Amino acid sequence: MEEAEKPAALDLQKLLNTRIVVHIRDGRKLNGTLTQYDEYMNMLLEDVDETMGDKPANKYKILVVKGGNVQAISI
């Protein structure tokens, strides 16, 4: 019996070139455009607004997010 391909919990392909909010384990939120990702959920975001709690923190033109630091993703 062949093993069926497992569906991904989150299909990042559908979110490419879309603004998303990445919730980081340390409480930060990154609001940016998803331009690339890999099988480890490492992501490249562009035009990123970082917030800590409700306070704006930083702005980044390009930011790499390590998949292991991601708690959740919302759109």
Question: What kind of feature is each model-predicted range?
Answer:
Residues 1-75:
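Conserved RNA-binding domains used in RNP assembly and mRNA/RNA metabolism
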